[in-house]
Every structure is written in structure tokens, then in C-alpha cells.
Amino acid sequence: MPLWSIAEGIPTLDVIKAHQFVEQKGAMLIGPNCPGLISPGKSMVGILPGQVFLEGNVGVISRSGTLTYEIVYHLTANGMGQSTAIGIGGDPVVGLHFRQLLEMFQNDPETEAIV
């Protein structure tokens, strides 16, 4: 089960402790300082502007919320929908990292490309 944290500026040691706790419970931490995640047409958690997303097969991962929206805007404008878009957060220490999410997208039958 993913847990999501929008808050920014959380002290680094607190994030490390939270990450360790979440891992011990078999869950995943997304963030902090992230816009959330969305699988268009299915579910959304966070502050993502859902109207720019289109259901499709492109996975999106970014540290920047604004860059996520910009990428998705251009994908959608060109008819390329998204399977899931995830903002991992811009703080120095975050829960899930690019490598972990790339592996998840590679194993996702609904994702054919990753940005």
C-alpha cells in the first residue's frame, strides 16, 4: 500500500525514520514534497490537475510537480495518454526512487513507455 506525503521541509532524519517504519510495515512512501500520483480514469491521490491527464499507456515519473504537469500536457495534446503519473518529491530524501518506479512500470502490463 503506498503512503503519500505532500508536506515539504520535513526534517531529513524524520523522513528517514518514516521511510524505515513504512518499509517495516510492507508499505511504500511517496514523497515528501510531491504532488501525488494518478492513474487517469481510475484513481488519484494528491493535488494533480486531473483535467490535463488522459488514460493511456505512458508512465510518467518526476521529482518536479510543475515538470510533471508540463510533460503530461504535451503527451495529452499529442494523443498519448498516461497509465500512471507519479511525482516522487523534490526533497533531498524521498520514499520511492526512480529506479524502484522504473521496475514497477516495466512490470506493469498497462505501461508501454516511460517518461
Please report, for each region that a protein language model flagged, where it lies by residue.
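Catalytic-core regions of core metabolic enzymes
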Residues: 1-115
